[in-house]
């Protein structure tokens, strides 16, 4: 019964909102988690009240971000159930998400980025692919899901830009720069055919399995070369943070950065001005004669 409700909600979200599969999978995991917790008290999603849901969402010891995400999924479910006539009320209406402290992204310096980008061995097909992937992610600020989801048709090497498919399947055009375009072009003509060995594949970045690389493989690629470059605590998303912060440091208008990142809300982008200011304060503290 619970699975049926969740399946129907996700189908509606896919048809009406065109949410991508990663988002839908996240909703499923959160709703199944809440359903399991409710079942321990003999309740179900269909008949839970506000107190039941509060107990299932606000669990001691769980990260607030996880609680907020689960509550968001529940709110979508009960809005849909009320609209479909499955329930006459919405028990999540008065439930508030927990306050979450903003995590300031760790800044990767331009010197560290240079070391990272220099790490792959471009004399090998895998190394040339990895070099192109790293260059592209730093040059464009793509989310890892956007980068691994690229087809070559999304890349215009002559104009030096890509068309990224972001959250909610929204398209945006992002400049990729000459250096990134050079390495993507070399990878496409030299390394990609060697990796595919005559097989066809729509994905731009391919693996030795002759299919598009996964998010997990992209994560491993970043971690491997970060280790070689002596950089700790880095992930594919760190390249997106570095891209945005370095642009802000060099004076690019925040709204332009917002468009390039695909942020719907400027407030989301403003975190990078704070990161840049923290970096600037550190530089002044280190080099100013009065510090």
Curated annotation (Swiss-Prot):
Return any one Pfam family short name. Answer: Phage_integrase
Its domain of life? Bacteria
Q: Where is the Core-binding (CB) domain?
A: 1-82
Identify a single GO molecular function assigned to this protein.
Answer: DNA binding
GO biological process terms on file:
cell division; chromosome segregation; DNA transposition
Q: Where in the cell is it found?
A: Cytoplasm
Repeat as a keyword of this entry, yes or no, is no
Q: Where in the numbering of this chain does the Tyr recombinase domain appear? A: 103-285
- Primary site of residence: cytoplasm
Outline what the protein does: Site-specific tyrosine recombinase, which acts by catalyzing the cutting and rejoining of the recombining DNA molecules. The XerC-XerD complex is essential to convert dimers of the bacterial chromosome into monomers to permit their segregation at cell division. It also contributes to the segregational stability of plasmids.
Oligomer and partners: Forms a cyclic heterotetrameric complex composed of two molecules of XerC and two molecules of XerD.
**Family classification:** Belongs to the 'phage' integrase family. XerD subfamily.
Query: What protein am I looking at?
Result: Tyrosine recombinase XerD
Q: Which species is the source of this protein?
A: Neisseria meningitidis serogroup A / serotype 4A (strain DSM 15465 / Z2491)
Q: Which gene encodes it?
A: xerD
